[in-house]
Each structure stands twice: as structure tokens, then as C-alpha cells.
């Protein structure tokens, strides 16, 4: 019995996207970071949070606690809409999604090398080109029991999202091709 049949029979077993995290590693503070913030805001529709350097690296001119990156967390419909556009950009850049990108509980990451690959984006010489890492986290209905404050409980192993389930979900929902090594 395929996962699709199980999901139709038991809807509580169908995985869903918990969150999509978009990481923008600019590597320096200043103008490039503020321009990157505008780019990520146009792509996601949300204001980004600045990430700080954890340690000093004089070779790159980075000091500890200096803002050098940006990140945005998307949930719900915003996450799904962004992911559809991200997969289009991923295909345009000529990359493939490998099964090794998925961990044992179905979460996966991929990178988009150029933000201009997204639909509706054009190259602007004053902005330049920015790449990003996209991390997708899965869950099933009922995962709230592990994070709620009262009567917290563990998720049983049979209710965790499996790697194969996440791959099938991504292929069916977004039409992405996952290559098995």
C-alpha cells in the first residue's frame, strides 16, 4: 500500500510543512546586507531577521556579533507559495534534488544560487545577485503534544515523518523530481 492510499484512509498520517526557513548568508555588514534584506523581503513578503557572527575572523573582516546574514521563517500558505516558486528557481538553475538531502525524519534543504531565477525577478546591477539556502521542516497532525506547555508528551516512532513519505509528498504536491543515488 502506497503512502497516498494511507493518507486518504488515515488523514492524521499525512505529512504537512511545518515551516520553511530561508537563510541568506551575505558575509558582511553594511549596504550589501540592507540590499539583501530588500531582496529577501520581496521574495518572501516578510521582514527578515539579522543573524550575527559567532566569532571574529580578521581575514574576512568579520567581528563577533556583527550582523552578517538574514533569515526568514515562513509557515502555512506563505511557506507553500514560496516553496512552489523556489522549486521553479531550483529547476531553472539546472540543479537536482537528491534523496540524500533528506534526513531520517523527512526534513530537507536545498540551495538556490541566484535570486533572479525566481519567477518575476529581473537582474538589477545596483542589487547584484544573492543566493540562499532553503530548509523545509515536516510534521504530521498531532505534533503539538511535544511542544505544548501542559501535558507534554513524546511523538511515537510510528507517527514520525519518514524520509520516503516526505519524498513522495514533495513529488506529488510540488512536482519536484527527487533523484535516488
Swiss-Prot record:
Similarity annotation: Belongs to the universal ribosomal protein uL5 family.
Gene name of the encoded protein: rpl5
Keywords: Ribonucleoprotein, Ribosomal protein, RNA-binding, rRNA-binding, tRNA-binding
Name this protein carries in UniProt: Large ribosomal subunit protein uL5
PROSITE patterns, alphabetized: RIBOSOMAL_L5
GO MF term (any one): tRNA binding
NCBIfam families attached to this UniProt entry: PRK04219.1 (NF003258)
SUPFAM superfamilies: RL5-like (SSF55282)
Amino acid at each position: 500500500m502506497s503512502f497516498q492510499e494511507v493518507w486518504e484512509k488515515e488523514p492524521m498520517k499525512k505529512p504537512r510543512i511545518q515551516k520553511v526557513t530561508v537563510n541568506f548568508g551575505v558575509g558582511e555588514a553594511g549596504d550589501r546586507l540592507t540590499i539583501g534584506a530588500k531582496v529577501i523581503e520581496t521574495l518572501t513578503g516578510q521582514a527578515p531577521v539579522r543573524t550575527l557572527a559567532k566569532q571574529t575572523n580578521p581575514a574576512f573582516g568579520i567581528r563577533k556579533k556583527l550582523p552578517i546574514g538574514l533569515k526568514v521563517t515562513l509557515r502555512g500558505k506563505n511557506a507553500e507559495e514560496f516553496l512552489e516558486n523556489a522549486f521553479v528557481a531550483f529547476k531553472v538553475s539546472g540543479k537536482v534534488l537528491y534523496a540524500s538531502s533528506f534526513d531520517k525524519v523527512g526534513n530537507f534543504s536545498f540551495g538556490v544560487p541566484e535570486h533572479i531565477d525566481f519567477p518575476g525577478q529581473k537582474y538589477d546591477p545596483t542589487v547584484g545577485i544573492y543566493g540562499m539556502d532553503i530548509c523545509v521542516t515536516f510534521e504530521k497532525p498531532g505534533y503539538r503534544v511535544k511542544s505544548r506547555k501542559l501535558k507534554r508528551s513524546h511523538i511515537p516512532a510510528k507517527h514520525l515523518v519518514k524520509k520516503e513519505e516526505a519524498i513522495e509528498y514533495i513529488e506529488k504536491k510540488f512536482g519536484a523530481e527527487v533523484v535516488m543515488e
